[in-house]
Amino acid sequence: MTDGTGALVFVKSLLAEYLSEKYGISVPAEKGVLGRLEEPSPEELEDSFARYAGDVTASRAEATAWHLTGTPETDGYKDLVTLMVPADKLRSCAKDHGVSVTELLCAAMMQAILELQAEKVPNPRHRKPVKVLLPVNLRKLFPSKTLRNFASYITPEIDPRLGACSFQELCALVHHKMGLENNRWTMRAKFAANVASERSPVLRVMPLFIKNIAMKAVFDTVGECKSCLCLSNLGRVELPEVMMPYVRRMDFIIGVQAKAPHNCGVVTWGDTAYINCIRSIREPELEYHFYRVLHRLGLPVKVESNMR
């Protein structure tokens, strides 16, 4: 239905309406808050994938990543570990390594997964690629104002069978992967493959139950199994000044994947970056390794959890 950017606009606008109703304040339509009495514009409802897709498609074939395993939680319970880091120190650390905050966190997560895999799989020849999926907000590359889903992805990866690498080398790998693919030409070719499938005359007349089976098969082949987890960073959240006194904190929590038990959502509110690590298994092994990596980088980290 939408992506992280669209969901944030919805939450901001909903919060503005609540505050207006409860406290009688007037919230201007700015900084991602929509005019609540206005009709949605056609641009907000646009399918920007269909509008900007080109004729050239990129291959969706990728190597399968290593998947973390553990004891499944009962009754659908989800464990959440939130790591809170001073935003200025996180930015400074990223700058020292010549990367963005998102790239630094991606490299740190990859380092944590590499260390965990080394514990679980002692023989390096039996290890699998470590890949972290980074969503890309396509509105920054194309002139779109849609509130529907308009995000693609980039998946930095490293194969531990090729030998050890330093953290700085990991940062460089992530940085150059982002630099190579985070452009409108590469992104257009990526999502053009999906749009071409949607436009297929065969799929248009195919019964829904068959279409669902086919879509699941494709997703299992080129979807979640191709990465260890998703790390999505919404960045710094801004609100109209009149709303600020009523908001203590913001978190960004994404659901776990069907075939991988971990995911990670990041958002910065005020002077703190909130890194929300969610999982559907009991063992907090990845979070422990991730915390250790951040600690080694000299970052002060506070941790809270809902573990039972």
Q: Which role fits each region the language model picked out?
A:
Residues G6-E17, L90, V101-L114, V174, ...:
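Structural preference for long, well-ordered alpha-helical segments in enzyme cores
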Residues T2-S92, G298-R308:
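Non-catalytic, low-complexity flexible loops and terminal extensions
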Residues M1-E21, V267-L286:
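Histidine-centered acyl-transfer/condensation active-site motif
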Residues T2, L15-Y23, K95, M109-V121, ...:
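Hydrophobic/aromatic-lined pockets within catalytic cores
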Residues T82, R91, E115-R308:
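Acyl-thioester-dependent acyl-group transfer interface
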Residues T2, V101, P122-H126:
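Short, surface-exposed helix-loop/turn micro-motifs enriched in polar/charged residues
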